[in-house]
């Protein structure tokens, strides 16, 4: 069988970004009902220092056995003096001690919400080696970028793959057995988001892949 993972970044308790009643949530539910698709939802624990995770929000997602909640940093933001240069790549600017404090703060909030995430993806993909050393201590696996993170060593299980749900040509098979799609729940800075057009397009991708492969829809932790 050929595995298929769908990962979605940046979900947090803000309307339009992964809350009950959002149209994107309906899209995900429909894909699960129609095909059996499962999802890794990568969530910052305190998005932009404005939207902390809440137990109600976490519980909403945990009710679905086709969802895995994963860590996507804490603030998904950087200090003002660095923002122009590194965007929101939170773990590019932190040293070991700072990164450990940040991860502990993040996991503390997750714990208050009743969940311990197994996996991690860096906001904006960027991470330095000291931060990677910290991340490796606290998570069972990391989703990394095969090019951006090529010089970074993680002392934990790692997975690569970031094909967009809006792809039309370049869909890759990783490790000869896994399709790995990566997307964002919303945002106006790229086209790889859960719009109606991309939802419809992704259904065509799944239809095509199901005709070509015996698909096994999984979350990343099910691959560990």
For each feature predicted by the language model, list its residue ranges.
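Non-transmembrane alpha-helical segments in soluble domains
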Residues: 29, 58, 107, 111, ...
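Well-ordered, non-membrane alpha-helical segments in soluble/globular domains
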Residues: 18-28, 52-56, 96-104, 167-168, ...
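A conserved mid-domain beta-alpha-beta active-site/ligand-binding segment of alpha/beta enzyme cores
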Residues: 153-175, 182-192
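Generic beta-sheet signal
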Residues: 3-4, 39, 174-183
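Metal-dependent polysaccharide deacetylase catalytic core of the NodB/CE4 family, i.e.
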Residues: 37-129, 183-189
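Active-site beta->alpha N-cap acidic-glycine motif
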Residues: 1-66, 214
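His/Asp/Glu-enriched short active-site or ligand-binding loop at hydrolase and phosphoryl-transfer sites
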Residues: 132-168
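C-terminal domain-boundary segment and adjacent tail
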Residues: 33-36, 143-144, 185-224
């Amino acid at each position: 069988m050929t595995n298929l993972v769908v990962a979605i970044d940046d979900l947090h308790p803000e309307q339009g970004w992964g809350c009950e009643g959002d149209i994107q949530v309906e899209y995900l539910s429909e894909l699960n009902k129609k095909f059996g698709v499962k999802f890794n939802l990568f969530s910052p624990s305190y998005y932009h220092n404005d939207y902390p995770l809440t137990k109600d929000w976490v519980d909403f997602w945990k009710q679905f056995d086709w969802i895995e909640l994963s860590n996507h940093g804490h603030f998904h933001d950087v200090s003002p003096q660095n923002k122009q240069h590194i965007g929101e790549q939170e773990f590019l600017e932190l040293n070991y001690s700072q990164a450990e404090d940040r991860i502990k703060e993040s996991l503390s909030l997750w714990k208050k919400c009743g969940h311990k995430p197994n996996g991690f993806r860096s906001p904006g993909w960027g991470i330095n080696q000291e931060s990677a050393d910290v991340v490796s201590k606290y998570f069972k696996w990391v989703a990394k970028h095969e090019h951006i993170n090529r010089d970074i060593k993680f002392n934990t299980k790692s997975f690569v793959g970031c094909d967009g749900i809006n792809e039309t040509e370049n869909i890759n098979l990783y490790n000869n057995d896994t399709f790995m799609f990566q997307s964002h729940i919303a945002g106006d800075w790229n086209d790889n988001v859960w719009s109606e057009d991309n939802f419809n397009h992704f259904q065509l991708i799944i239809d095509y892949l199901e005709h070509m492969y015996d698909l096994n829809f999984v979350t990343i932790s099910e691959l560990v």
